[in-house]
Design a protein with these regions (language model features):
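Bacterial N-terminal signal peptides that target proteins for export
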Residues: 6-19
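Bacterial N-terminal signal peptides
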Residues: 18-29
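Boundary at the C-terminal end of the N-terminal hydrophobic targeting segment
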Residues: 31-33
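N-terminal low-complexity, Pro/Thr/Ser-rich intrinsically disordered segments
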Residues: 36-60
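Active-site mouth of glycoside hydrolases
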Residues: 53-300, 310, 333, 337-346, ...
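Short, conserved loop/helix-junction motifs that constitute active-site signature segments
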Residues: 294, 320-324
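Substrate-binding surface in catalytic domains of secreted glycosidases
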Residues: 308-316
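Aromatic- and carboxylate-lined catalytic core of secreted/periplasmic carbohydrate-active enzymes
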Residues: 364-404
Length: 404
């Protein structure tokens, strides 16, 4: 694999299931408005009143689906991860100098039928020092919110990324648990203050795939490994120090939720997790972040599922473990280890319990892919985007649980 590749495929294969590299190579997709001003007091910019087309999204009164707050209509997520562009760059790498690219990509995602875009914000780009947020990055985030409102797309804002280890400040990496959590709280406090008034925010995802160390193992690195140059999995502590894992997870979640709620008491909060219940099924334990001991302040469940060939039923059985009385979103999915048809079967089979599905888009349209001499990964991507576009009216037109 080329070192510059930053795709989710590498992350999933190497960090979770350690499949042979030769298998990975056959599946990996080759990667191919004026700024808002900061307030005079130096605090983050807020986004002004929303476009009328976007309603605020909340869990339903039964706690088991999403609804549009004003109309009460059910809302089903059909979205994409916009985690990098076609050349593997993170959004902060180009959203200043190439804003037109972001605008075009949002139009393209909308044309595919997506209603939610998951963006991945990096800690180092939004935090200058242990006590100071980056006003420039926050202004650009406010600009992104305006674009989302104008385009009619909701944002799943995933934060605290350290995907490029070389960009992580040494002072942040050297911190102990308490100080690191304080910086993470500053990140979310600043982001929430910027986003609080915009209905374009679907949710805040506290961190992509947080993990904890073993009960009797003290770790030395906050990041869980180097996968083709990117780090997608991150530890929230280096040492449990005799504490139950769920207690540490709850303390971390509650601290960051409190930081958000200091500015924003409306938008939903979640954590996108590795589905260990799937990887170890049927010997599955209760999820750490979505247990009754931990998830009190999380509004819905987010899990990342990549069904294997011939194992769709197993994936569905494992997914059911995460049906814990909250809305459920499959926040990452792609035909990485199965066919497009099998992933479609997984989607259909999950509609009885799931309230949304989020795949991937990397800035290359179906038409652009069709114009190329595609290799296998490119063909998989093209076929999947075609499926995604065709499936959108069915998903968005009929709802899910109430119609199954």
């Amino acid at each position: 694999l080329r070192a510059e590749m930053k795709s989710i495929f590498t992350k999933m294969e190497l960090s979770r299931v350690a499949f042979p590299v030769v298998f990975l190579i056959t599946q990996v997709t080759l990667l191919q408005a004026d700024p808002l001003t900061e307030r005079s007091n130096g605090s983050p910019p807020s986004v002004s009143a929303p476009e009328p087309e976007l309603e605020w999204i909340r869990p339903g009164k039964d706690g088991n689906r999403f609804v549009r707050q004003e109309s009460g209509a059910e809302f089903v997520v059909w979205g994409v991860n916009y985690d990098h562009d076609r050349s593997g760059r993170l959004i902060e790498d180009y959203w200043n100098e190439e804003w037109s690219t972001v605008v075009e990509d949002f139009k393209e995602m909308k044309s595919l039928g997506a209603n939610v875009v998951r963006v991945h914000l990096q800690t180092a780009r939004f935090i200058k020092t242990s006590h100071e947020a980056n006003g420039s990055a926050l202004r650009q985030l406010a600009r992104l919110l305006k674009l989302a409102e104008k385009t009619g797309l909701y944002l799943d804002i995933t934060g605290l990324g350290c995907y490029h280890k070389q960009d992580v400040p040494e002072w942040y990496d050297a911190m102990d648990e308490t100080d690191r959590w304080d910086v993470q709280a500053l990140f979310w406090s600043s982001v929430a203050e910027t986003c609080a008034q915009s209905p374009a925010v679907f949710c805040y995802d506290l961190m992509n795939e947080p993990i904890l160390p073993g009960a009797r193992k003290k770790e030395t690195d906050w990041l869980a490994g180097d996968f083709a140059g990117s780090h997608f999995v991150q530890r929230i502590t280096l040492d449990l120090a005799g504490r139950p894992r769920k207690h540490v997870a709850k303390a971390w979640v509650d601290k960051l939720v409190s930081a958000i709620r200091g500015h924003d008491d409306r938008h939903m909060i979640t954590v996108g997790v590795i589905p260990w219940a799937h990887h170890f099924f049927p010997k599955a334990n209760q999820p750490i972040f979505y247990s009754k001991e931990t998830d009190e302040n999380l509004d819905f469940t987010s899990v990342h599922f990549y069904p294997k060939k011939g194992e769709v039923n197993k994936a569905l059985a494992a997914l059911a473990i995460y049906d814990v009385g909250k809305p459920l979103v499959i926040e990452e999915m792609f035909p990485l280890k199965c066919s497009v048809q099998e992933l479609g079967s997984f989607i259909d089979g999950s509609r009885k319990i799931a309230d949304g599905w989020i795949s991937f888009y990397w800035g290359q349209t179906i038409e652009e892919l069709a114009a190329e001499d595609l290799n296998l990964p490119g063909a998989i991507t093209k076929n999947w985007l075609e499926y995604f576009r065709v499936k959108a009216p069915e998903i968005l037109g009929t709802g899910n649980k109430s119609n199954q």
